[in-house]
């Protein structure tokens, strides 16, 4: 996400768990378009309401304390939080059954947590955010698209379930957009 945003003129603050993340960012992004900080995502080194928009993709399901991560994202956002998660109401229902097959296809698959829309909405509401908007990305499991490595074919595969409304009902991962209530100042709660 950082590359297209920086190409559109955005100046970014990127965090990661290791210095190598900053090295990777520097290899892909124009100099002067970002700052990088190695830090603990469960205790971000930024002030409350530090950023108008906070993005977090492909991380939430891999963190043991997902509620702590979401709390921190909400804390440092003054307006919008965007993130994604794997929804339990999808092909992920077969996650435990098919994990070994998925791992054999992808090689680097890690275990992950599945969430419901209700869990996500409840967590966001607790941190002063309006009910979120949910955008399911894919009907077919992401492993299928990664294995194909053909964006055009993936779009063709995804079109019928999208037209039929199946992606809206059963798609995953889900991109979430939540907007902070302007009248609700940040309440830190437990840290």
Model-derived segments and spans:
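A conserved beta-strand element that flanks and buttresses the S-adenosyl-L-methionine
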Residues: 55
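Short catalytic micro-motifs in class I SAM-dependent methyltransferases
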Residues: 58-59
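A short glycine-rich, Lys/Arg-flanked "PGG" loop and its adjoining helix->strand segment in the class I
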Residues: 67-82
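Class I SAM-dependent methyltransferase SAM/SAH-binding core
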Residues: 1-43
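Short alpha-helix
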Residues: 109-134
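A C-terminal cap/extension of S-adenosyl-L-methionine-dependent methyltransferases
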Residues: 133-191
């Amino acid at each position: 996400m950082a590359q297209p945003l920086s190409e559109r003129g955005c100046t970014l603050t990127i965090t990661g768990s290791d210095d190598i993340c900053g090295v990777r960012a520097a290899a892909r992004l124009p100099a002067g378009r970002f700052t990088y900080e190695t830090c603990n995502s469960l205790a971000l080194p930024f002030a409350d309401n530090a950023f108008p928009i906070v993005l977090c993709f492909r991380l939430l399901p891999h963190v043991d304390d997902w509620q702590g991560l979401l709390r921190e994202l909400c804390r440092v956002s003054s307006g919008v939080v965007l993130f994604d998660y794997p929804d339990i109401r999808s092909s992920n229902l077969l996650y435990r059954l098919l994990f070994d097959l998925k791992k054999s296809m992808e090689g680097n698959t890690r275990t992950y947590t599945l969430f419901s829309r209700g869990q996500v909405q409840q967590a966001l509401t607790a941190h002063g955010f309006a009910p979120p908007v949910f955008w399911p990305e894919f009907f077919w499991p992401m492993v299928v698209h990664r294995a194909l490595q053909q964006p055009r074919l993936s779009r063709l595969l995804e079109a019928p379930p999208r037209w039929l409304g199946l992606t809206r009902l059963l798609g995953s991962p889900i991109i979430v957009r939540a907007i902070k209530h302007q009248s609700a100042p940040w309440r830190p709660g437990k840290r």
